[in-house]
From Swiss-Prot:
GO terms for molecular function: DNA binding; RNA binding; zinc ion binding. This is Zinc finger CCCH domain-containing protein 28. It comes from Oryza sativa subsp. japonica (Rice). InterPro entries: Znf-CCCH_Muscleblind-like, Znf_CCCH. Keywords: DNA-binding, Metal-binding, Repeat, Zinc, Zinc-finger. It holds the Pfam family zf-CCCH_10.
Length: 346
């Protein structure tokens, strides 16, 4: 009777891994014999856990991330653009300060409002506005920016305040502009109609109140006025001085213009069709300022008394050369015809 064989623990177990490494073809039947499930089936795929831990991301994920981030960047750019457009830089004064809207406001004299002020407008430190000037609830008036540049052609119809020189100086100082002419003392003889010197000859300032200012004809400025007896002024003073061009713009609804013209007539730029200034020749005669205000009582005035047909430029008129020779036949000559008793032209 055969006895059952007992396994020997010391027996050597064949190493299938080493055999597979040495001979893969021979190891395949052995693997199939030991593991029936592995026979005839391919090797299982890598687990998904290892795919997630892949060091290099797939290009599809890169594109998806860039696509998802692109709209956010576009929105942020549009917001920044809209904010930059809305926050526009406000105008600044020459000294770098921001502009203030009350720099042209002047307090009205309370005694003047009650008809009790005994001081003249050139002596009182408060405003004496014209009846056409609008006074706000705080008893303040807004100075005419055009009058600060001698370029207000509205005259007595202007609804803004035309300040005298001493108030002009404080207004110009508040906006950072210095005008040496404003600091000149006002000629008292001129205010009484007694000064025989012209504005260029007198060492004092010839200041004319708003009541004496004439309204410049707008058609004349455009070269279109054909009226023989125009009720508006056809007078143009010299252009504005260069320092006054640096005054910053403050009120967009007002044409920003330095102190009232000494003529009593606002300073205007010449129209495109106007001839060049003739101050350098011998035929230029300065216009009488008192005559423009209907205050000249001199019998033989050495200044010109032009009519409505004469062209006035740089406070002067040009004498008609044909008239001096006795040959002018124009019915409405634009040049000045001096009277026989006049000694203004030699």
């Amino acid at each position: 009777m055969a006895s059952a064989e007992t396994p020997n623990p010391d027996a050597e177990i064949p190493n299938t891994d080493a055999a597979a490494a040495a001979d893969p073809a021979a190891a395949a039947p052995a693997a199939a014999a030991t593991d029936p499930a592995a026979a005839g089936s391919p090797s299982p795929p890598l687990p998904p856990r290892k795919r997630r831990l892949s060091p290099t991301p797939s290009p599809t994920r890169r594109s998806s991330r860039s696509r998802s981030r692109s709209p956010r960047r576009g929105r942020s750019r549009s917001r920044s653009r809209s904010r930059s457009r809305g926050r526009s830089a406000s105008p600044r004064y020459p000294d770098g300060k921001r502009r203030r809207h009350n720099d042209l406001n002047v307090e009205v004299c309370r005694d003047f409002l009650r008809d009790r002020c005994a001081r003249a407008d050139i002596e009182c430190k408060y405003a004496h506005p014209h009846p056409t000037v609008a006074v706000d609830r705080d008893s303040k008036v807004t100075a005419c920016a055009d009058s600060l540049r001698n370029n207000c052609f509205r005259g007595r119809t202007c609804r803004y305040y035309h300040p005298p020189p001493h108030i002009q100086e404080s207004l110009l100082r508040s906006i950072g502009v210095e005008d040496p002419k404003v600091k000149m003392q006002v000629c008292r003889d001129f205010t009484r109609g007694r000064c025989s010197r012209s504005a260029n000859e007198c060492r004092f300032l010839h200041h004319s109140p708003l009541e004496d200012c004439a309204i410049v004809c707008q058609d004349f400025l455009r070269g279109r006025c054909d009226r023989k007896s125009c009720r508006y002024s056809h007078v143009m003073a010299h252009p504005m001085p260069p320092p006054m061009r640096d005054i910053p713009m403050q009120y967009p609804d007002m044409v920003y213009m330095p102190p009232p013209a000494p003529l009593g007539v606002p300073m205007m730029m010449p129209p495109p069709s106007a001839p060049a200034a003739f101050s350098g020749n011998n035929y230029g005669v300065e216009v009488c300022r008192d005559y423009l205000k209907n205050m000249c009582n001199r019998e033989s005035c050495r200044f010109a008394h032009p009519d409505l047909n004469n062209e006035v430029m740089n406070t002067q008129v040009e004498v008609c050369r044909d008239f001096k020779r006795g040959e002018c036949n124009r019915p409405a000559c634009r040049f000045y015809h001096p009277p026989a008793s006049s000694n203004s032209i030699g």
